[in-house]
Amino acid sequence: ACVFLARQGKSKTEIKEYVETTFGYNLNRTCDEIRPDYHFHVSCQRSVPESIIAFLEGTDYENTIRLAVSLGGDADTMGAIAGGIAEAYYGGVPDDIQAEVLKRLPENFIDVMQSFYDRFVLK
């Protein structure tokens, strides 16, 4: 829902209100409030809201991912969730980050990513 709303040009406030109302998540905490007591948890109820909070608090794509990862716990998943929302909201992955990632990936991964992006994202 967050990625869809971000792609529709909704504000962070609108995204927050929709998620709170629709899914019942408490998004009124800050990353600083979450960080001291947060630990790995396999439940989406303990990683998705925190990832969304990192997005809401983030100031750009990279800052959002850094905030999500800084929470600890299931950091790779949370970075992916927050980063996905940030990519949609901020209009893409910054060129410097994208270039660094692409040079580290096998060509077949890049082909699959480009096909997916062309088919589902650029529409």
PLM features per residue range, with description:
Residues 1-58, 63-71, 84-88:
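Amphipathic alpha-helical interface segments
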Residues 50-123:
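Catalytic phosphate/nucleotide-handling subdomain of diverse soluble enzymes
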